[in-house]
Amino acid sequence: MSQKGLFGILGEVVKNTGLILHRTGCKMQGDYAYVEKLNRHTRLTAFGDNAPIVGQKSFIAPNASIIGDVVIGKESSIWYNAVLRGDVNSIHIGDKTVVSDRTVVHCSSNGPLGPKPTQIGDKVYIGPGSIVHAATILGESFIGTGSTLCDGSVVEKNGFLEAGSLLTAGKTIKSGEYWGGSPAKFIRQVTKDDESQLEKIIEQNINLSEQHEKQTSKSAKELNNDLLQKYVKNRTRSDHILNNPL
């Protein structure tokens, strides 16, 4: 028997012995034993009397969390590690809206301005790592990466907020205005180029979300086959590390 085969057998024996010892120890501890519970992540989670509603052709990333009273329109995309938590009030998102990776959207039941839902219109782009709390963002607006919108803040139609900005409670970005900073202040008027860039970003995300929906809907076997095909293809490339002499 080869050394590799011997270590494989020994490893299996040690692993099984450890599992047996763990189970035995838990039985001996009785009610004091801590047993890890399996946590199966679900994209959509009911809360109280409410369950999320998702429109046709919308993409919800596998590790995104949509909780409670949340309504999402058609062709919108909720990207990886985003959290939409409609537990204490409601969240409404329109059509063709992009909620990027790691964004948190919440609402309020007892905030500084009282109970407030979160409302996000059509064709809105919210950049990665943003926080939207009990705010209103009307259609065709842009929220830059890492921005924060506090309770009662409003972005009117075609309003733009620069990356890394803080829109404080109760503040309003008027239609066609471009704001930025912490706290955010008016910088300039939105240009045709700004509007054109937003349209491109929205369309790119719609197309990209369709590809991600197709890929993330595959079974584990299909995904594994895809990986194997990629590895085989890469091995034939002259610049691949496996084909380069050390």
Swiss-Prot record:
<dbReference type="InterPro" id="IPR050484">
    <property type="entry name" value="Transf_Hexapept/Carb_Anhydrase"/>
</dbReference>
<dbReference type="InterPro" id="IPR011004">
    <property type="entry name" value="Trimer_LpxA-like_sf"/>
</dbReference>
<dbReference type="Pfam" id="PF00132">
    <property type="entry name" value="Hexapep"/>
</dbReference>
<dbReference type="InterPro" id="IPR047324">
    <property type="entry name" value="LbH_gamma_CA-like"/>
</dbReference>
<dbReference type="InterPro" id="IPR001451">
    <property type="entry name" value="Hexapep"/>
</dbReference>
<protein>
    <recommendedName>
        <fullName>Uncharacterized protein DDB_G0288155</fullName>
    </recommendedName>
</protein>
